[in-house]
Amino acid sequence: FDVIRKKKNIGSLISKFIENEDSVIMHSVLKINVKVLFIPAYKFFQETKETWTNGEFVSIDGFTDFEDDREYKIIGNDEDNFFIASGMDGQLKLDKNIVPLNYWNLEMLNEKEVFDTQKGIVRTIEVKQLEDEKIKINEIEILANKYVFNASKNPKDKGPFPEYTLWYFAKELMKMEFKNPNDKKNIITIIRNDWSL
């Protein structure tokens, strides 16, 4: 995926799915670097490894570095019929069936609560499906399923959780857009750059 702001590429999101017998590891790296007059104005980095076994989310190992001094190490594992995780709010004992807040997984939109992989916390979510919409991916026009995604605010959040607009085609994430709460005038677009029919 390319990360676009004001028609300029400001970063990338790379996700790899590594299959190993009955498990899949989803390794994702998101890098954003905004410069204004060649001076760094905003940086963000997130690396996450999710492990899924027989279709069930069983562990996570991640790290998030925000533009300020906030850094979070995210760890979580299935233990004794619970999902034991740690992050911004310390250790959490969660429902074993919780799934990560990761937009590649279309089924995540059906959940009421998800595990935020950037901060290691639980958020309640609200999703609304809109009318299908034609979008272009690599100059190919497709009719995509469109959703609006909102999530609850944590008391430690520095601002509201941004509203996301998501587009899927054949259950694959193609595009998403949101406004950074600190940069409300400009929309951030994250769009597939490796897809073709």
Name each model feature, range by range.
Residues F1-D78, M108-L197:
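Acidic, serine/threonine-rich low-complexity disordered tracts
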Residues D80-V99:
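Acidic/charged, solvent-exposed loop-and-adjacent secondary-structure segments enriched in E/D, K/R, S/T
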Residues D95-E113:
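Beta-strand/loop-rich accessory regions of lumenal/periplasmic or secreted enzymes
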